[in-house]
Every structure is written in C-alpha cells, then in structure tokens.
Design a protein with these regions (language model features):
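Flavin-dependent oxidoreductase catalytic cores
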Residues: 1-367
Length: 367
C-alpha cells in the first residue's frame, strides 16, 4: 500500500515543534457548550474523539474573547477565568493523544446578536445590522479598539494557562477582524481604515500584543478568507496581507477557501487555485494550512501539490472522526453525506449539534 505524504510528520520551523502528521481539524461551530461560556463535556468528547482519530492539530470551535463578541448560543468562551478549569480538562484529554490543541479566538462583531450579548453589535463602521435593535452597528471607538486588543490578548494568555499549544486568530468569514479588513465594511478614514495597512492594523496590533504576553514557543496563527465579495475582501489585498504577515513571528497562515479546488472569483483569467496563487507569490512563508472541501486522500494530495503544508478539514471529520488515521491509504475515499443520526451519535455529536447539522442541506437523515 502506498503511503500518503500527509501521514508524515511536520515541523513548525520557527519553534521546532513536530506534528505527528499534516492533518488539521479545522474550527467548526457545534453549539454544544454552556450559556456561561464554560465548555461542556460533550464538546470536549467531540474534540477528543478526533484527537484519538489521529489528527495532527485539533482546533476548537471559535471561542469568544468577550461577552459582546459572542455570536451564537452554545459557544464556549475564554473571556473569564471561570472558563480555565474545564479548558484544562480539554487540553489534558487532547494531550493524552499525540495531537496538538489550538484555540480559535474570535469576536463576532456585526454578527454578534444583541439578543444574545445584550450589546449593540460593534464593528469597524456604522453598518446595516439586522442583529441590532437600532438596525445599525456601533462604530468602534479608540477605547473600544483598545479593549478588543486587550480581550484577545487576555484570552490568548488564558489559553496558555489552560495548556493549549497555541491559538488561531479568526480573521475570516466576515467576523470582526475581517470586518476591519474588508473595503465594504471598513469605511473609516482614521488610522484603522483606508489603505490595507490601516485596515490590517487591528489584526497586526492583536498579534503584537499577544506575542508580548505569551512564551516564545506558544503557537500563534491567523485564519483568513482569500476572498469575500460581500465585505470587500479581494484576492490582491489578501496576497499583500500574506506578505505583511510573513514578516511577523507567527507560525501559520490558514487559508479558508470553502473549496480548495475552485479558482478566484475576481481574477477570472487566472487558472490557478487560491492556494496556488498565494503560496506561489512568496518564498519563506510560515506554515500554510488550507481548508475547503477536501474529502479523499487524492484531494489531500492535490492540496499539498497546490502548496499547502498542512491539510485542514471540517465536514469530513464530522462523520469520520478517524479520517486522519485512514488518510495514509492513497485510495481512501470515505462516505459522503448524508449521515444517519445514529452515525453522528456514534461520532460523538450530541443532539444539539445534530440538530444544527440538519440545517445543512442533505447532511443528516433520520435512518
């Protein structure tokens, strides 16, 4: 049997830490935790099952760095010391395997409903906002921005205290950091808006502050969306952003592509994939993770050839928690959805998570 390259160990160059293989469980919303932000045993079991399944890195669901940054019910938080005890239980469980555990830190911004947080949603600018009682978001003041940076920093330090191997800053999918990055959502004319270097200032200041407050060997990475037309994130700006990020002492850039085999929506004459375009734009990049619609071993091998160092997966790991162990077989091509409720229960999804996945067309069937 031929063995896939994805099953081979990988070393983070900056800190000389070795992963067992090149697989990454990407962050996925699962809504399994408690209203006070304490992570539940169900969510721990869900992640632990995938660590037992051989993933090199386990990434938690997005975890809010402040009460006002919460975006959905059942989201666990890291904004208060009361969260640490149960997070230690999570990291201890993951470290009983060979996996690393990374917390994805985020603030929902305009996507944090007032009915959940009790606060008018905060964003880079005053924007139309269905989640606000006023119909508008609040433009972040200098004081707000300072608090945001401190919230991310304090949350990262709590993750260190709780035993995480590192953190991933969620700069993708239209949440707060990407609202600052987007041309259509960042309408500011101060140092936090305008040209890309200003729109990226929040992200860069968060990184700088975190790096000053955690040990040198604590993993710090960033997840970004190469393109989001609705908020004005263009590929040309993402390429420039990657150029800025590669000069920083970070360990990875995670490209959230949704489908790693698709081409750019903006560069219609470009034949290469988003991952190819970005990885071929520079030398000496930090570790590149790419995620989106990888299912089989051949898919994963294809993505490595595109220039990714590590392979992120989401949906396939919901139904196949031991995907990372089986991917070494180059002929591995696991079942696609739909999955039965029984299959998902056996894969350590609780009733709430299964109900949430029923919102995804043709993902869940009763029998």
């Amino acid at each position: 049997m031929k063995i896939s390259k994805i099953a081979q160990p990988y070393i983070f160059k900056r800190i000389n830490k070795k992963l067992n293989n090149r697989t990454v469980l990407a962050a996925m919303t699962n809504k399994q935790s408690h209203d006070n932000g304490i992570i539940s045993n169900d969510e721990i079991n869900w992640l632990h099952e995938r660590a037992k399944g051989g993933f090199g890195i386990i990434t938690t669901a997005a975890t809010n760095v402040s009460i006002e940054g919460k975006a959905w019910e059942g989201e666990f938080g890291v904004y208060d010391d009361i969260h640490i005890k149960q997070l230690v239980k999570l990291t201890s469980a993951i470290h009983s395997t060979k996996s690393f555990i990374i917390a994805q830190l985020f603030h929902g911004g305009i996507r944090s409903p007032q009915k959940i947080t009790g606060h008018i949603p905060l964003s880079s600018s005053v924007l139309e906002c269905a989640e606000s009682s006023t119909g508008k978001s609040k433009k972040a003041t200098e004081k707000d921005i300072k608090k945001i940076i401190n919230d991310f920093t304090n949350s990262a330090f709590r993750c260190y205290e709780a035993g995480f191997d590192g953190i991933e800053l969620h700069g993708a999918h239209g949440y707060l950091i990407s609202q600052f990055l987007g041309e259509k959502t960042n309408l500011r004319n101060d140092k936090w808006g305008g040209k890309l270097k200003n729109r990226a200032r929040l992200l860069l200041n968060i990184i700088d502050s975190i790096k000053k407050n955690v040990p040198e060997d604590f993993i710090v990475g960033v997840r970004i969306s190469p393109e989001i037309e609705s908020i004005g994130i263009k590929l040309k700006d993402t390429i420039k952003l990657v150029g800025i990020l590669r000069a920083l002492p970070i360990d990875f850039i995670h490209l959230s592509c949704w489908d790693v085999f698709l081409k750019s929506k903006f560069l219609t004459d470009e034949k290469r994939t988003l991952t190819q375009i970005i990885t071929e734009s520079y030398t000496n990049l930090p570790t590149i993770i790419s995620t989106g619609n990888v299912w089989s071993s051949k898919d994963a091998e294809n993505l490595l050839k595109q220039g990714a160092d590590l392979i992120g997966v989401g949906r396939v790991a919901i139904g196949h928690p031991y995907w990372a162990t089986k991917i070494s077989d180059l002929n591995y091509n696991p079942q696609r959805p739909p999955f039965t409720v029984s299959q998902l229960k056996n894969a350590k999804l609780n009733e709430t998570f299964i109900s949430y996945m029923k919102n995804w067309k043709n993902f869940v069937v009763e029998k």
